């Protein structure tokens, strides 16, 4: 089935947040829930998982190039990334559901994206021992990016002002639930599930070549160095921002006059948004929320 049309592009058409399976959600990511949970993963599927605005599209594009850049180069110039790497739980206007897109993929492996927290990932991915690539981004930059994203997309609730948005992020009242639980959930899963590769957005920005090499090692790919360097260049943020097949300018739910889908792609942009008081409050809250995990982030590089 296809997602319903938006009635308008005004704030009145934005969905309401509601509690669902223990997290906050909007209907665009729950309307096809039964089919999502019953999704039949294959052993060679690769699941790309992130909290929203943590580098999903970047890593999706890298993986697409690693597997199909040479064998099917026309994909890169003619098929938008959201068709090449379906968003599994999404039911958005004017395009098939994520499950339909995933089931219709003719590629091997199938690259599939999700923002679901680890406990809501369809069981078949674990049962089939699929490779899972998780990308995490420091909370301060993540909340800034998510704020600007929610300003420009009609598939998310009205974000309100920055101060109230930051508070709701700290309270975990964001689509796909609390950032803290999301990043820690996959970090804990990694301890018992060896086919999970945990990446950091900050490491990607600092040294993309190295991170692509590590990704290849995890995937068992013997991609030549010159090929990896080429991929690093093609997937540079500025290049992707100009690329209509990766910048989401062809999807109907986003208003680029408000903000770009791919806005800055930098580390430490949070310093341009947080006041001193907000930063102190956030740090105190963060320390409490993250006190029981070994997971560490960098807020600058």
Language model region names:
Residues 1-199, 245-301:
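PAPS-dependent sulfotransferase catalytic domain
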Residues 57-69, 199-223, 231, 239:
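PAPS/PAP-binding and catalytic site of the sulfotransferase fold
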Residues 74, 223-228:
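Acidic/polar loop patches that form or flank catalytic/metal-binding clefts of enzymes
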Residues 117, 204, 236:
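Short, internal active-site loops enriched in acidic
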Residues 143, 166, 205, 212-213, ...:
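Generic structural signal for individual residues within well-ordered alpha-helical segments
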Residues 218, 222, 234, 285-292:
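Hydrophobic alpha-helical segments
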Residues 228-234:
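Acidic/histidine-enriched alpha-helical segments
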């Amino acid at each position: 089935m296809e997602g319903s049309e938006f009635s308008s592009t005004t704030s009145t058409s934005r969905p309401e947040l509601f509690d669902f399976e223990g997290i906050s959600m909007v209907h665009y990511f729950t309307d096809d829930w039964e089919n999502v949970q019953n999704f039949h993963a294959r052993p060679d599927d690769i699941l790309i998982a992130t909290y929203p605005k943590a580098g999903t599209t970047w890593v999706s594009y890298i993986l697409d190039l690693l597997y199909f850049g040479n064998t099917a180069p026309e994909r890169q110039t003619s098929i938008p990334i959201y068709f090449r790497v379906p968003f599994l739980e999404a039911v958005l206007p004017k395009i098939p559901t994520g499950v339909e897109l995933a089931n219709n993929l003719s590629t091997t492996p199938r690259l599939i994206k999700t923002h679901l927290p680890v406990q809501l990932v369809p069981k078949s991915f674990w049962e089939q021992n699929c490779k899972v690539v998780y990308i995490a981004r420091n909370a301060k930059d993540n909340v800034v990016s998510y704020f600007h994203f929610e300003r420009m997309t009609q598939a998310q609730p009205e974000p309100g002002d920055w101060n109230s948005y930051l508070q709701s992020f700290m309270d975990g009242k964001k689509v796909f639930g609390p950032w803290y639980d999301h990043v820690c959930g996959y970090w804990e899963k990694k301890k018992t599930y060896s086919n999970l590769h945990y990446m950091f957005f900050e490491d990607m920005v600092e040294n993309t070549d190295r991170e692509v090499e590590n990704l290849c090692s995890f995937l068992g790919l013997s991609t030549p160095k010159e090929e990896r360097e080429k991929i690093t260049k093609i997937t540079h943020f500025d290049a992707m921002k100009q690329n209509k097949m990766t910048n989401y300018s062809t999807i109907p739910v986003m208003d680029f006059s408000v903000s770009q889908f791919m806005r800055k792609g930098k580390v430490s942009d949070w310093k341009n948004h947080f006041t001193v008081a907000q930063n102190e409050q956030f740090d105190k809250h963060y320390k409490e929320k993250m006190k029981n995990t070994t997971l560490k982030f960098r807020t600058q590089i």
